[in-house]
Amino acid sequence: LRACVGKGFMDFFNEVDADVFCIQESKLQEGQIDLDLPGYHQYWNYAEKKGYSGTAMFTKEEPISVSYGLGIEEHDHEGRVITAEFPEYYIVTCYTPNSKDGLARLDYRMTWEDAFLAYLKKLEEKKPVIFCGDLNVAHKEIDLKNPKTNRKNAGFTDEERGKFTDLLNAGFIDTWRYFYPDTEGIYSWWSYRFKAREKNAGWRIDYFCVSESLKDELESAKIHTEVFGSDHCPVELVIKK
């Protein structure tokens, strides 16, 4: 995030004027940055390990309550989840663990996925859920430029894709795909290597998902491919209420 702030972050932040603005992989510790965001409440979840992971949420309306993590010790050392409760719904920001080179963390990733879905369903017992973040998976072949060469790579394994399918089958909507079911060539992440962004050799791994009960409230979804400053670009959801 510190690098982004020097690359137009505040211009974008002010331009979109979001009611809720979420960040994943902030790579910050407490006190390392002081963002001046008039009119916003700021919530940060830091990883115990320095310069790693982390999430943040900035909200215009003060939430009823805010919680950090999943409430499961083995999953809550890396600052990956923030949940804010509002009158009509919960908003959750999530930075899903990367399965890493050689799929070194794939087994851990699978346990995380099950715990995260169970967490969302528990919230949903009380009110609908909107969750967003870097979910570190391209769901279908149209969600990345080079599916054939990435079948066994982190972010496109059958196991990871299957967990995202489970999430949709559990009653959540991938909002961008809801509006654009067949659109190809729109991505949210590009490697810094191989001139990937220049060639648009990207992956769509950043999502807004919502409970099925919010389907009629969906107004628009957007992936801001024109915004630079990171290897990811921002994604946006507009709802009616």
Label each region the model flagged:
Residues K27, Q32-S99:
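Structured beta-strand-rich core segments of catalytic domains in phosphoester-bond hydrolases
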Residues K60, A84-P87, S211-E212, L237-K241:
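Active-site beta-strand termini and strand-to-loop segments that position acidic
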Residues L1, S26, L135, C233:
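Active-site metal-binding loops of divalent metal-dependent hydrolases
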Residues D17-V20, H41, A115-A201, I205:
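Metal-dependent phosphoesterases centered on the DNase I-like endonuclease/exonuclease/phosphatase
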Residues G71-I72, T96-E113, K148-N153:
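Surface-exposed cleft-lining segments at the edges of enzyme active sites
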Residues R2-E15:
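Short, acidic/polar
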Residues K222-K241:
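Surface polyanion/phosphate-binding segment centered on an Asp-His-Pro turn
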Residues K50-S65, I186, R193-D216:
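Conserved beta strand-loop-helix elements of the APE1-like EEP
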